[in-house]
Amino acid sequence: MIKLKNFTELNSQEIELIFKWRNHPDINQFMKTKYIDFEEHLRFLKKLHQDSSKKYFLVFQYEQIIGVIDFVNITTKSCEFGLYAKPNLKGVGQILIQEIKKYAFENLKVNTLKAYVFKDNRKALKLYQQNHFTIYDEDKDFYHICLKQSDCKALPS
């Protein structure tokens, strides 16, 4: 059983946990901003209350926190997503991707999911490609990937 908890509803323990995860070397090595201080973290969480173009969720599986998924630059047509698993927890990437697709297509009602993947993050790129995301562009540091909802409907379950 998967449950999503909006970052705007986190308790103090969850806020601190996410702060630690966000700055963990295994996670922040694949983030544009490598380190944030706690005050910056709190300001970010506060801004989420007023910003409808961003949604961040803590992901629970059977009451255990397994990771974070997020949606940014949300429009009526598309959004960008991100994810990270609890440090040292293996095998939950597929669960997080499924929740991203489900939330984006069923709740946000977007047609296209997009992301930027660091070129040296081979593990993430492989996961996305296994889930039928395609590379539509690239720059010096990133692959630009996307998945259209129509492509999902054509896939076998």
Model-derived segments and their meaning:
Residues 94, 106, 119-137:
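Conserved active-site alpha-helix within GNAT-family acetyltransferase domains
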Residues 20-34:
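Helix-loop element at the rim of GNAT/NAT acetyltransferase active sites that forms part
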Residues 34-88:
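Acetyl-CoA-dependent GNAT
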